[in-house]
Design a protein with these regions (language model features):
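Cell wall/extracellular polymer interaction/catalysis modules
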Residues: 19-189, 198-205, 211
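Soluble or luminal CAZymes and related metallo-dependent hydrolases
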Residues: 195
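C-terminal functional extensions of proteins
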Residues: 210-217
Length: 217
């Protein structure tokens, strides 16, 4: 039997294929946000060695004189309200917060009766008084009279004659522990920040150049 073309086509046709539903897989949840822990710097002066007003004024001076204070890892403060026999020069670690205290002298003109307390301050040459305000350390020096020292540049009207007056940080016999034990107080300088000979090498290295020394009364 000969089939017609239409019959042949009908015989070759296949049954329609049922379409399976497409199931979309759920997208994986986004990874949890990783919180970067905030690093809280340690507190400055946890032992509260420095008078709060002195600390706050020194911190302000760092910003006011930022063009000259180029290093902010540590600073040096002098509290002229304290007795000369007490440790009243402070190295403040601005990164770690630690404070180290040293003794330093004031000028004989600031304490003419040698009471151990600085009473008056001046920027005038030949006054032999201490000067207050912000200084920039200017590096290690060497003088014919005082030997190794740290040079200072006065940054304010109250101390901008520091170079002319040769106001420096230097070692002195009258700042040594033996003098203190004998006299009950330190001796007086001509306005310099005199320190014990044993403290000077470390201070000379660490003060360097471009750090703040701030004296206040």
């Amino acid at each position: 039997m000969i089939l017609g073309g239409s019959a042949m086509l009908a015989g070759c046709a296949t049954a329609p294929v049922a379409q399976m539903p497409i199931v979309l897989a759920a997208a994986p949840p986004p990874p949890p946000l990783q919180r970067i822990p905030q690093i809280t710097p340690p507190p400055l002066d946890p032992g509260r060695l420095v008078r709060p007003e002195l600390m706050s004024r020194a911190m302000a001076a760092l910003d006011v004189h930022s063009h000259r204070i180029t290093l902010r890892d540590r600073m040096y403060l002098v509290d002229f309200q304290k007795f000369s026999g007490d440790a009243r020069m402070f190295e403040v670690d601005l990164i770690g917060g630690r404070v180290t205290a040293f003794r330093t002298c004031h000028g004989r003109g600031s304490d003419p009766e040698h009471s151990g307390f600085a009473r008056t301050f001046s920027n005038t040459p030949e006054s032999y008084m201490s000067s207050v305000g912000a200084y920039a350390t200017a590096g290690a020096g060497w003088g014919a009279q005082q030997g190794p020292n740290v040079l200072l540049d006065g940054l304010e009207y109250s101390n901008n004659m520091a170079r002319d007056r040769a106001i420096i940080v230097h070692g002195a016999d009258y700042a040594d522990p033996e003098f203190l034990a004998r006299e009950g107080k330190l001796g007086r300088s001509y306005g310099c920040f005199s320190t014990a000979h044993t403290d000077l090498p470390m201070l000379r290295e660490r003060m360097g150049e471009g750090r703040l020394l701030f004296a206040y009364a």
